[in-house]
């Protein structure tokens, strides 16, 4: 999910993005099975009945006494049947609806792409002060942190690989969005219908389904005109998955007409260039320059006219915080002047947008979604409907971005007046669709990368992109 560059925004080198640490509960480990072997008492049969000492011909022997044949009395031992401990393998369904917890019984999820840091890093020796400043971030990047991220990434991979098989000309976008979101909720095993359940795991923000010159922040909403995918469309699919507030943000573009192949290749290569340059102490200005250089080395031919691919100037990649899709660091797609660097423990969404238009985005009409600002003041809030709605938002979404569809899914009704009051008072921020000029085409690719102490993990990397 792209972060739009605000007007008159200045990025300082000392901005902090340390997410608060959270307490996570480890699943209990299974105790090793143990048991006691019970033998029959001397003088009792294996069936538990006393032997009859008065039985004619019975030999009376003390415990351990040697019989006439010189052998100790041995009792027959029942052979124990070996239990088949092998568990049946559970496979994912099509569409994916089996919770990952049922497939990964150990609750350990696969690593993504691991990239070792270059040994020629020009600033590997960080000062003690900087290390102390990031100590809380590094402490939070423990096994639970990594496992939550890997689970969210695995959900994203399985869902997107399925939806790529059903995205074809003729599909309605109002049908596609629920396919993605229902898959995420099924695989995380959190439907989000009970109060607070969506904060445990599920959608990190509404599914973005943006056609052609619509670059970002469009999703089907109730009452909107139906949109059907066409052969000549360029469709960007951008959705996020979170587990315990650890957000994986990843996006890709699909087109059916091969005339757009170079546009998609330009953006995918530019994103990979940004991922290659990302790392501890990497200068954001250097990353931006590398992205632009790769992106703008491509051109496309549309209607017998050669058009250069341009890097979009006023939307950026961004760092990700706990339960917050947008942090305070931005990664532009064009050369910029900033002293800001990436830091150990950071989580970044490295994304790029390339356009055949003017490569500058404007707000369009309509609302994509909403996000609660936890630092806002509610002193000016007087409408009871607004207060009730705010309570619902806090309990079910917190600072995660949500849409009207998500509210109505919870059964919330007649919320428009209350929402208007929340937006007017700056308590909730609204997001509008972002568009380039009509007739242009925009593509997007995006991955989430974790800057771990000894390597970077492109957590959302898959076989598809």
Swiss-Prot record:
Domain of life, source organism: Eukaryota
Keyword Hydrolase tagged: yes
Binding-site list for a divalent metal cation 2: 249, 318, 351, 446
Region listing for Disordered, in residue ranges: 1-89
GO terms (BP aspect): proteolysis
Residue ranges, compositional bias (Acidic residues): 43-54
UniProt keyword list: Aminopeptidase, Cytoplasm, Hydrolase, Metal-binding, Protease
Role summary: Cotranslationally removes the N-terminal methionine from nascent proteins. The N-terminal methionine is often cleaved when the second residue in the primary sequence is small and uncharged (Met-Ala-, Cys, Gly, Pro, Ser, Thr, or Val).
Subcellular location, principal: cytoplasm
Name of the protein in its database record: Methionine aminopeptidase 2-2
Binding site for substrate: 217, 326
Composition bias type Basic residues, residue spans: 1-11, 73-84
Record-listed a divalent metal cation 1 binding positions: 238, 249, 446
Cofactor annotation remark: Binds 2 divalent metal cations per subunit. Has a high-affinity and a low affinity metal-binding site. The true nature of the physiological cofactor is under debate. The enzyme is active with cobalt, zinc, manganese or divalent iron ions. Most likely, methionine aminopeptidases function as mononuclear Fe(2+)-metalloproteases under physiological conditions, and the catalytically relevant metal-binding site has been assigned to the histidine-containing high-affinity site.
Cell compartment(s), UniProt: Cytoplasm
Keyword Flavoprotein found: no
Entry cofactors: Co(2+); Zn(2+); Mn(2+); Fe(2+)
Reactions this protein catalyses: Release of N-terminal amino acids, preferentially methionine, from peptides and arylamides
Xref: InterPro entries: Creatinase/aminopeptidase-like, Met_Aminopeptidase_Type2, Pept_M24, Pept_M24_MAP, Pept_M24A_MAP2, Pept_M24A_MAP2_BS, WH-like_DNA-bd_sf, WH_DNA-bd_sf
Principal EC category: hydrolase
Protein family: Belongs to the peptidase M24A family. Methionine aminopeptidase eukaryotic type 2 subfamily.
GO molecular function, one term: metal ion binding
Catalytic activity, EC: 3.4.11.18
One annotated Gene Ontology cellular component of this protein: cytoplasm
């Amino acid at each position: 999910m792209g972060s739009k560059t605000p007007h008159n925004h200045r990025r300082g080198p000392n901005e902090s993005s340390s997410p608060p640490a959270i307490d996570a509960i480890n699943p209990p480990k299974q105790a090793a099975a143990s048991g006691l072997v019970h033998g029959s008492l001397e003088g009792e049969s294996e069936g538990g009945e006393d032997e009859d000492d008065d039985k004619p011909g019975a030999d009376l022997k003390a415990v351990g006494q040697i019989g006439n044949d010189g052998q100790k009395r041995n009792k027959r031992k029942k052979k124990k049947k070996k239990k088949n401990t092998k568990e049946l393998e559970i496979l994912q369904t099509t569409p994916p609806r089996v919770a990952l917890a049922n497939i990964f019984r150990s609750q350990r999820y696969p690593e993504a792409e691991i990239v070792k840091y270059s040994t020629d890093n020009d600033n590997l020796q960080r000062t003690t002060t900087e290390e102390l400043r990031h100590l809380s971030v590094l402490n939070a990047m423990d096994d639970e942190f990594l496992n939550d991220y890997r689970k969210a990434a695995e959900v994203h991979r399985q869902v997107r690989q399925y939806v790529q098989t059903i995205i074809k000309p003729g599909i309605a976008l109002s049908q596609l969005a629920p396919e993605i979101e229902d898959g995420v909720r099924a695989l995380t095993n959190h439907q989000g219908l009970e109060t607070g359940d969506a904060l445990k795991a599920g959608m990190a923000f509404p599914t973005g389904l943006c056609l052609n010159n619509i670059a970002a922040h469009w999703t089907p909403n109730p009452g909107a005109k139906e949109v059907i995918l066409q052969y000549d469309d360029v469709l960007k699919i951008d959705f996020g998955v979170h587990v315990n507030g650890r957000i994986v943000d990843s996006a890709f573009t699909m087109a059916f007409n091969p005339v757009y192949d170079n546009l998609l290749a330009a953006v995918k290569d530019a994103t990979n260039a940004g991922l290659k340059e990302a790392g501890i102490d990497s200068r954001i200005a250097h990353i931006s320059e590398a992205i632009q250089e790769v992106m703008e080395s491509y051109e496309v031919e549309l209607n017998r006219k050669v058009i250069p691919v341009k890097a979009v100037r006023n939307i950026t990649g961004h760092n990700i915080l706990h339960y917050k899709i947008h942090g305070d660091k931005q990664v532009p797609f064009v050369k910029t002047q900033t002293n800001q660097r990436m830091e150990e423990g950071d989580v970044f969404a490295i994304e790029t947008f390339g356009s055949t238009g003017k490569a500058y985005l404007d707000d369009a009409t309509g609302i994509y979604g909403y996000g609660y600002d936890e630092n806002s003041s509610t002193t000016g809030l007087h409408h009871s409907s607004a207060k009730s709605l705010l309570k619902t938002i806090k309990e079910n979404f917190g600072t995660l971005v949500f849409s009207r569809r998500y509210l109505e899914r919870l059964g919330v009704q007649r919320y428009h007046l209350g929402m208007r009051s929340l937006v007017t008072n700056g308590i909730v921020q609204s997001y509008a669709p972002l568009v380039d000029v009509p007739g242009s085409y925009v593509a997007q690719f995006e991955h989430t990368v974790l800057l771990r102490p000894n390597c970077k993990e492109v957590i959302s990397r898959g076989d598809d992109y």
